[in-house]
């Protein structure tokens, strides 16, 4: 038998049953699940300093446990001196067991380390049950060594679910233990 992350086991054993009874689904297959988690980091100064972009890719890889890819500008923005196709950020798309491990680490280890943390905004859903929020400092993750980073920068986390609406999405993430402030 292979390794199953604790959150995945908790989802299959408990959360599905709770969601089916709460939303009166006819089948357990209707219960929403987390499809993927996208962690991204924009590096605006990468135009001037390529080392910052490599540092961002390395840090995202350390945080998530999966290799990050560089993202390119979709269009030119003269005000920011950005040309189309220029590398300006990094992202990681997590699925499967790595996704559940990252979510556990985020909810139980990283978010409680945020100074004056009172929960994440519960209204940041997109209308389709997907949830996005920002983290101001990457140093809340224990994998990042404060002495070795180029600069403190934030990152964005998007949790994509199969929920049909925001109410189902919020219920799903709440049962996983996401600390919503409202």
Curated annotation (Swiss-Prot):
Protein name per the record: Large ribosomal subunit protein uL5
Family from the record: Belongs to the universal ribosomal protein uL5 family.
Keyword Ribonucleoprotein: yes
NCBIfam families linked: PRK00010.1 (NF000585)
GO terms classed as biological process: translation
UniProt-listed Pfam families: Ribosomal_L5, Ribosomal_L5_C
One Gene Ontology term of the molecular function aspect: structural constituent of ribosome
Gene3D superfamilies in UniProt: 3.30.1440.10
């Amino acid at each position: 038998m292979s390794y199953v992350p604790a959150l995945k086991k908790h989802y299959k054993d408990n959360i599905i049953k709770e969601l089916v009874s709460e939303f009166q689904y006819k089948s357990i297959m209707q219960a929403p699940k987390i499809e993927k988690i996208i962690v991204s980091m924009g590096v605006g100064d990468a135009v001037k300093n390529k080392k910052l972009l490599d540092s961002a890719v390395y840090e995202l890889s350390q945080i998530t446990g999966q290799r990050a890819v560089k993202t390119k500008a979709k269009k030119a923005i003269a005000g920011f001196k950005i040309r189309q196709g220029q590398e300006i950020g990094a992202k990681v798309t997590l699925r499967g067991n790595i996704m559940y491990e990252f979510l556990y680490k985020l909810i139980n280890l990283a978010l409680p380390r945020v100074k004056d943390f009172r929960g994440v905004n519960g209204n940041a859903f997109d209308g389709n049950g997907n949830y996005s929020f920002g983290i101001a400092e990457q140093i809340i993750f224990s994998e990042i060594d404060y002495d070795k980073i180029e600069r403190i920068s934030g990152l964005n986390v998007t949790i994509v679910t199969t929920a049909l609406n925001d109410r189902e999405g919020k219920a799903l993430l709440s049962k996983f233990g996401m600390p919503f402030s409202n």
